[in-house]
Amino acid sequence: MTQQLQSLIDQAWEDRANLSPKSAPADVREAVANVIGQLDRGALRVAEKQDGEWIVNQWIKKAVLLSFRLEDNAPMAAGGFTQFYDKVPSKFANYTAEDFAAGGFRVVPPAVARRGSFIAKNAVLMPSYVNIGAYVDEGTMVDTWATVGSCAQIGKNVHLSGGVGIGGVLEPLQANPVIIEDNCFIGARSEVVEGVIVEENSVISMGVYLGQSTKIYDRETGEVSYGRIPAGSVVVAGNLPSKDGSHSLYCAVIVKKVDAKTRAKVGLNELLRGD
C-alpha cells in the first residue's frame, strides 16, 4: 500500500503545475488525503532515524506540498469569537473530549496545530503554532509563542522555550526538515532553520540562530562546521573575527559537551554559565 501511495504521489508531483482544486483526479486527492491522515495519526513521518542516520521521506513531503494545490480556501470557525480563511483545517476542529483524553496531550488556548501534524502523549502546547507535517514527540513542551514549522521533527522530552522558531520546508522551500533530537533544550527566541539537525541531549542558549550558513565553532577543538550540532553540546551565541581583523561575524559557539548523566544532574543555568 505504501509503495502504491509513494508512486502515485511521485507521479502527481511531476504534474503538479497542472493540478488545481477543480482539475485534480480523484485518485490523487485520495492519496494525498491518506498521507495527511497518516501524518496526523503519527503513522507516517517526513523523516525517520534508521541505523543512526536521519532519512527524509521526500515523497511524504511532496504530499504535504501537493495538499495546498488541492484545496480552496474556506472559512474556519475559531471558538465563536472569530473566523479564519485557509486551506488547512485545525487538527482539533472535530475533537471531542474523548479524543483529547485518548491523545493524552495538553493544548492551552489559543494554541494552533494544523491537521497533518502529530502531537504525542504528554506533550504540552502552550499558546504556540505547529504546522502541517510536523512531529512533536512524547513529553515535549512547546512554550508560549514558539513555532514548529512544517515537517519539522521534534524528539522526546524536548523543551522549546518562549518564542523559539523551528523552521519549516514550505516557505521558502527547503530540501530537508529541521530535526531536534531527544532531550534537547532550545532557549528563548532562538531560531533553528534550513534543515539543521540538533542532536540529542544538547542545550541551545537563548538567542542562538542556526541555519545552514551559520558557522558552528567548537571552542575545544577550534573546528568550524555547518548544519549540525553534535550530541551533548552546550551552545551559545558568539562571533568570529575576520581574517584581517577589521570586523567579526555572528557564529554559534559550542562551549562544552556533556553526557546524558551530566545533562540530567546539572541545572541548565550551571551548564551555560560554567567555564
Curated annotation (Swiss-Prot):
Cell compartment(s), UniProt: Cytoplasm
Record's keyword terms, sorted: Acyltransferase, Amino-acid biosynthesis, Cytoplasm, Diaminopimelate biosynthesis, Lysine biosynthesis, Repeat, Transferase
Nucleotidyltransferase as UniProt keyword: no
Keyword Cytoplasm part of the UniProt annotation: yes
GO biological process: diaminopimelate biosynthetic process; lysine biosynthetic process via diaminopimelate
The protein's annotated pathway: Amino-acid biosynthesis; L-lysine biosynthesis via DAP pathway; LL-2,6-diaminopimelate from (S)-tetrahydrodipicolinate (succinylase route): step 1/3
Example of a GO MF term: nucleotidyltransferase activity
Cellular component aspect of the GO annotation: cytoplasm
Enzyme Commission code(s) on record: 2.3.1.117
Gene3D superfamilies attached to this UniProt entry: Hexapeptide repeat proteins, Tetrahydrodipicolinate-N-succinyltransferase, N-terminal domain
TM ranges: none
Reaction(s) the record says it catalyses: (S)-2,3,4,5-tetrahydrodipicolinate + succinyl-CoA + H2O = (S)-2-succinylamino-6-oxoheptanedioate + CoA
One family name in Pfam for this protein: THDPS_N_2
Family, similarity comment: Belongs to the transferase hexapeptide repeat family.
This protein's name: 2,3,4,5-tetrahydropyridine-2,6-dicarboxylate N-succinyltransferase
Organism of provenance: Ralstonia pickettii (strain 12J)
